[in-house]
Amino acid sequence: MKMAGWKKKLCRGHHLWALGCYMLLAVVSLRLSLRFKCDVDSLDLESRDFQSQHCRDMLYNSLKLPAKRSINCSGITRGDQEAVVQALLDNLEVKKKRSPLTGTYYLNITRDCERFKAQRKFIQFPLSKEELDFPIAYSMVVHEKIENFERLLRAVYAPQNIYCVHVDVKSPETFKEAVKAIISCFPNVFMASKLVPVVYASWSRVQADLNCMEDLLQSSVPWKYLLNTCGTDFPIKTNAEMVLALKMLKGKNSMESEVPSESKKNRWKYRYEVTDTLYPTSKMKDPPPDNLPMFTGNAYFVASRAFVQHVLDNPKSQRLVEWVKDTYSPDEHLWATLQRAPWMPGSVPSHPKYHISDMTAIARLVKWQYHEGDVSMGAPYAPCSGIHRRAICIYGAGDLYWILQNHHLLANKFDPRVDDNVLQCLEEYLRHKAIYGTEL
């Protein structure tokens, strides 16, 4: 009997010990689960949960873009020459084999918008309160290469921003339908209400932006600045970095605006007419309205909301808009001239001390072939590592380190058919910096 009682006590002791262990494990598990609790659908990276490295890692892994090629993007963004050479050699091997995503692909995948946004890794919540409180507007003028458009949209997308997309009327129907399918998945992305056929170097390129300006001003989104883009652009700053840069402008605009050369003055000396292309006539134009001095720049701007409003509503601005309609490449002198007009919000004086080069403005980073050379001998930048079109560098992987050293918000031109590795690394760099706040 004594032996049986001893066995019962022993069993009861083991039972209590095991129960205690289970309870201890449960408490530890609960504490760990609370410690590592991460809601990846949280609206703010500054929330308490996301202060932990674990949660940041979870979010980054859920949004990390799949690498198409095994290249050393961290090395490339830091200017490591071995990594750059390997990427350039890899590009020579694969660029003719790579098939871009097609309109049909996007028409199919966007039938399920949530699947499309998840699979293509769109960031679907504001990454900080500062960004939430400073929405940016985009005018996106595109005409071809649907994958380029979708990747550009993904790179600049944030749910608090607003995006107007203008598609060239002449674009193939499949392209138009694919763009419509993509933007139908986002409440803050829309097609311009009026579309025009865009002819190179003609007024229609400006009209496309003006149409988006009108639509964006009617939006309920209280955007602060407007950036305009084309299909060969790509951001080189995160949305958070853009917000910081735009705040530092303090209501000023940023765009190239310089005294025109004699050859560029010919662009508005005679009237131009448009058929399928733009051609000059023998009809001389009257001087610019309101004795306004003309300046030249490029098609890209960083413009305050007040500037945009005055482009459309100010009578003096409208007179200049009408006057440049029959000039050559009016987008390269309309914005540059309005930026020096004293009645325009955020403008700067016409005095030579206020001339702004494309390298000084933050709107767009471009490598011009005729400026490339030996930096140690005074050239503004080294030769293009990609190819040239119309004397503009189509960037290669060897340009990325230089690109990232500059203060511009976007760069031009990129083409994955020329070098997809530079885009892959830029996408990886921006996504990493957006989540972690640090470079690769």
Curated annotation (Swiss-Prot):
GO terms for biological process: protein glycosylation. It is a single-pass type II membrane protein. The chain crosses the membrane at residues 13-30. Residues 31-440 are lumenal. Pathway: Protein modification; protein glycosylation. Pfam families: Branch (PF02485). InterPro entries: Glyco_trans_14 (IPR003406). Its EC number is 2.4.1.102, 2.4.1.148, 2.4.1.150. Glycans are attached at N72, N108. The keyword Repressor does not apply. GO terms for cellular component: host cell Golgi membrane; membrane. Disulfide bonds join C73-C230, C164-C384, C185-C212, C393-C425. It catalyses: a 3-O-[beta-D-galactosyl-(1->3)-N-acetyl-alpha-D-galactosaminyl]-L-seryl-[protein] + UDP-N-acetyl-alpha-D-glucosamine = 3-O-{beta-D-galactosyl-(1->3)-[N-acetyl-beta-D-glucosaminyl-(1->6)]-N-acetyl-alpha-D-galactosaminyl}-L-seryl-[protein] + UDP + H(+); a 3-O-[beta-D-galactosyl-(1->3)-N-acetyl-alpha-D-galactosaminyl]-L-threonyl-[protein] + UDP-N-acetyl-alpha-D-glucosamine = a 3-O-{beta-D-galactosyl-(1->3)-[N-acetyl-beta-D-glucosaminyl-(1->6)]-N-acetyl-alpha-D-galactosaminyl}-L-threonyl-[protein] + UDP + H(+); a beta-D-Gal-(1->4)-beta-D-GlcNAc-(1->3)-beta-D-Gal-(1->4)-beta-D-GlcNAc derivative + UDP-N-acetyl-alpha-D-glucosamine = a beta-D-Gal-(1->4)-beta-D-GlcNAc-(1->3)-[beta-D-GlcNAc-(1->6)]-beta-D-Gal-(1->4)-N-acetyl-beta-D-glucosaminyl derivative + UDP + H(+); 3-O-[N-acetyl-beta-D-glucosaminyl-(1->3)-N-acetyl-alpha-D-galactosaminyl]-L-seryl-[protein] + UDP-N-acetyl-alpha-D-glucosamine = 3-O-[N-acetyl-beta-D-glucosaminyl-(1->3)-[N-acetyl-beta-D-glucosaminyl-(1->6)]-N-acetyl-alpha-D-galactosaminyl]-L-seryl-[protein] + UDP + H(+). GO terms for molecular function: acetylgalactosaminyl-O-glycosyl-glycoprotein beta-1,6-N-acetylglucosaminyltransferase activity; beta-1,3-galactosyl-O-glycosyl-glycoprotein beta-1,6-N-acetylglucosaminyltransferase activity; N-acetyllactosaminide beta-1,6-N-acetylglucosaminyltransferase activity. It is an enzyme of class 2 (transferase). Residues 1-12 are cytoplasmic. Keywords: Disulfide bond, Glycoprotein, Glycosyltransferase, Host Golgi apparatus, Host membrane, Membrane, Signal-anchor, Transferase, Transmembrane, Transmembrane helix. Its main location: host cell. It is found in: Host Golgi apparatus membrane. Belongs to the glycosyltransferase 14 family. Non-essential glycosyltransferase that can synthesize all known mucin beta 6 N-acetylglucosaminides. Mediates core 2 and core 4 O-glycan branching, 2 important steps in mucin-type biosynthesis. Has also I-branching enzyme activity by converting linear into branched poly-N-acetyllactosaminoglycans. Contributes to the post-translational modifications of structural proteins. Was acquired from an ancestor of the African buffalo around 1.5 million years ago. This is Beta-1,3-galactosyl-O-glycosyl-glycoprotein beta-1,6-N-acetylglucosaminyltransferase. The lineage of its organism: Viruses, Duplodnaviria, Heunggongvirae, Peploviricota, Herviviricetes.
